[in-house]
């Protein structure tokens, strides 16, 4: 049996070696072949001869299924697979860009490039047009800005929530990236 840096028994998902307390087990050897139902002593001896661990894979089966393997390597591979899975999960964020009804062309283009970058990275984009003072009387200008943004980004995005009404002193639209 190899010496394995052992976590506390309560934290370990599988029982190994002498922790297995049954009379007989269904054994799978290190090559993945069925060795049949054997006594626990015989299974431990086979694991010791192979200089590996006896790991209880399925404790609820009758008799429990045990496998001869390197437990440290098994835990490492399991952890590595979990990390890889976590890495593949993308958390979608909502990025916000604020416009004003009188946003100049140069500023508009800079903000548009930022929106394109956000959408290409897979994030959602929240476009807000804020009105101050007398601008509230010309809400149509702000809605035209949102319409222009929507048209400029139509190829790479889809409108998730359109600016139907004002929320206080601002009009809001949310764009999501198109599925590839």
UniProtKB/Swiss-Prot annotation:
Lineage: superkingdom: Bacteria
Molecular functions (GO terms): ribosome binding; translation initiation factor activity
GO biological-process terms attached to the record: ribosome disassembly
InterPro entries to which the protein is assigned, alphabetical: T_IF-3_C_sf, T_IF-3_N_sf, Translation_initiation_fac3_CS, Translation_initiation_fac_3, Translation_initiation_fac_3_C, Translation_initiation_fac_3_N
Record bears the keyword Protein biosynthesis: yes
UniProt keyword list: Cytoplasm, Initiation factor, Protein biosynthesis
Subcellular location: Cytoplasm
Pfam families from the UniProt entry: IF3_C (PF00707), IF3_N (PF05198)
Keyword Protein biosynthesis: yes
SUPFAM superfamilies according to UniProt: Translation initiation factor IF3, C-terminal domain, Translation initiation factor IF3, N-terminal domain
GO cellular component, one term: membrane
Family: Belongs to the IF-3 family.
Function statement: IF-3 binds to the 30S ribosomal subunit and shifts the equilibrium between 70S ribosomes and their 50S and 30S subunits in favor of the free subunits, thus enhancing the availability of 30S subunits on which protein synthesis initiation begins.
Subunit structure: Monomer.
Protein name per the record: Translation initiation factor IF-3
Lineage: Bacteria, Pseudomonadati, Pseudomonadota, Gammaproteobacteria, Pasteurellales
Underlying gene: infC
């Amino acid at each position: 049996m190899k010496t394995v840096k052992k976590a506390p028994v309560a934290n370990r998902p599988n029982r190994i070696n002498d922790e297995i307390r049954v009379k007989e087990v269904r054994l799978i050897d290190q090559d993945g072949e069925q060795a049949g139902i054997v006594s626990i002593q015989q299974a431990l001896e086979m694991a010791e001869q192979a200089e590996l661990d006896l790991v209880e894979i399925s404790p609820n089966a009758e008799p429990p299924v045990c496998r001869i393997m390197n437990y440290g390597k098994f835990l490492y591979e399991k952890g590595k697979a979990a990390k890889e899975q976590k890495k593949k999960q993308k958390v979608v964020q909502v990025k916000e860009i604020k416009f004003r009804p009188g946003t100049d062309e140069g500023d508009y283009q800079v903000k548009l490039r930022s929106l394109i970058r956000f959408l290409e990275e897979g994030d959602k984009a929240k476009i807000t047009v804020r009105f101050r003072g007398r601008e509230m009387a010309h809400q149509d200008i702000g809605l035209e800005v949102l319409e222009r943004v929507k048209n400029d980004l139509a190829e790479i995005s889809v409108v998730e929530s359109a600016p139907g009404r004002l929320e206080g002193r601002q009009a809001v639209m949310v764009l999501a990236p198109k599925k590839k």
